[in-house]
């Protein structure tokens, strides 16, 4: 019932699962927005921005969820969304869209600077920039790029995105063994376990049953 009544963002690993969930929602008269490239920018990210701006429920993939930016964050903060994650999200990974040579070039030209304590990469050049490093600039401004040894570049999912949701439900198992559990602990995000009970085609959350966890 809460899935129907509340605005939600449902994130799934697979594109074909998006279509399957859309069909289920249609059959139950639940209106959802599926991001497409049918907009002026030809971008699914632009499409999900339109959905959030219009207070619509959304079904999308983990890949698209990873690309949410400050504009998406603003819309999420202004509306009361619930997040459903089908499996854990990739919250930390090596950033491979920039070569070490280009990274050193930006460092030497004083376009970026690495925080000596945290390792966070900051975009410090104040001039208006539009070029091949624009995506990297946006990530630096989000505060999600870190450097190890001035060469290895690490991307982290912006914790502000998770904090913008009223509630988050993660559908997975052995969560404590997942990187996202450590990520939540690092940011002092509290969570609790629940079990799922199913009967007559309906499923409800119940108190956590440890025997199901083993």
Task: Set out the residue ranges of the language-model regions.
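Signature of the SF2 helicase/ATPase Hel1-core->accessory helical subdomain module
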Residues: 62-191
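Short, charged/polar "capping" segments at the starts of alpha-helices
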Residues: 16-21, 42, 177-179
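Interdomain hinge/linker at the junction between the two RecA-like core domains of SF2 helicases
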Residues: 177-214
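A general structural motif
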Residues: 5-7, 29, 54-55, 78-80, ...
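Conserved Walker A/P-loop ATP-binding site and its immediately adjacent core
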Residues: 3-29, 36-37, 63-64
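Conserved interdomain hinge at the start of the Helicase C-terminal
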Residues: 1-3, 159-161, 214
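Inter-Walker segment of RecA-like/P-loop motor cores
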Residues: 28-67
């Amino acid at each position: 019932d809460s899935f129907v009544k509340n605005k939600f963002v449902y994130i799934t690993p697979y594109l074909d699962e998006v279509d399957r969930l859309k069909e289920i929602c249609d059959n139950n008269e639940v209106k959802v927005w599926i991001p497409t490239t049918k907009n002026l920018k030809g971008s699914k990210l632009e499409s999900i921005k339109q959905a959030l701006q219009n207070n619509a429920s959304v079904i999308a993939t983990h890949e698209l969820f990873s690309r949410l930016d400050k504009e998406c964050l603003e819309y999420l903060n202004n509306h009361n969304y619930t997040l459903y994650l089908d499996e854990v999200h990739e919250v930390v990974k090596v950033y491979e869209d920039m070569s070490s040579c280009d990274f050193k070039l930006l460092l030497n030209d004083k376009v970026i600077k690495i925080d000596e304590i945290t390792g966070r990469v900051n975009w410090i050049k104040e001039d208006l920039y539009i070029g091949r490093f624009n995506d990297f600039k946006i990530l630096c401004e989000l505060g999600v790029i870190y450097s190890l040894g001035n060469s290895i570049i690490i991307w982290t999912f912006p914790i502000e995105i998770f904090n913008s949701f009223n509630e988050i439900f993660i559908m997975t198992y052995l969560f404590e063994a997942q990187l996202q559990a450590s990520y939540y602990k690092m940011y002092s995000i509290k969570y609790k376990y629940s079990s799922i009970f199913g009967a007559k085609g309906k499923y409800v959350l119940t108190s956590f049953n440890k025997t199901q966890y083993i």
